[in-house]
Amino acid sequence: MKKSFLMVAAAAAMLVATGFTACKPNSTPKEIDIYVAGYENSGTEDAAKVWKNGKELYELTDGSKDALALSVFVVGGDVYTAGYEDNGTNKVAKVWKNDKELYELTDGSNNAIASSVFVADDKVYTAGYEGKVAKLWKNKSATDLTDGSKDAYAYSVFVAGSNVYTAGYENNGTNDVVKVWKKGSEHLVLTNGSNNASAYSVFVVGEDVYTAGYESNGTKDVAKVWKNKKEIFHTDGSKNATANSVYVVGDDVYVAGSEGGVAKVWKNKEELYDLADNGGAQSIVVHNGDVYVAGDEKEGSTRAAKVWKNGKELYSLADKGGAYSIFIVER
């Protein structure tokens, strides 16, 4: 089952653009720029947007048709954004570079969404779906991860060296099954299909593949994280919960998601921050020990797009909107 975007981390947990290496001792911390992808509703439809340091950077669509920006990746001063724009009949998967459309990945004949973007070696990798098929695009060239006989979706893509990892789900005829693909082929099957489950985020360190998502226990959705094939984190199952984004620094595993409608961050299986009593934590990045999260919080009858730093609100981006992906670049 394709999950509502208001509660999905469509973006992959993003690395800091300068790499994973920690700052050298006694070095002066560099200033950073914080990029966020999401949407704002200022009329009848959602407009795809990118913010930089709390201010609107790009309005990717004009708001005349429904659109979302679900993932952002910055490299070499260029801002790549993945999402979709409705054509009046179906959703069309798209990638933008800076404020211009770069790729229209699908022709609009079937519903399609680009959920995650990752740029490596001047190649643009995008994960998503078209129709019932989970897909991975390299620039504009598509690879079908599934055969289309059952519903499937690729939510997250991560490139590590020459390996391209994609995470999502494929239905087995009864329930959705968590899967990770590597170089376009099935790599890990993380649930047995007895209950619905999905992966929303994949993060790779060396040979270790971390996957975040959820698995139903039959009555409630349980937030889960797997390291390779082993489950390493789960909520207690008393409330609906999901792990939307995972980020790893050394031996520390950070997770953003929600439990019982509360936006939360966990670190090494323990709750670290309770961000909002009625909200969702969609994407997480850790930089120089600081924890940055993009998501949304319900305020009155609407949801507001937010960024938190170390558990405290840093930016309110849109009074009516949502934030799905965060990316940090050192200046």
Predicted region positions:
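Residue-level hotspots at or immediately adjacent to binding/recognition sites across diverse folds
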Residues: P29-R331
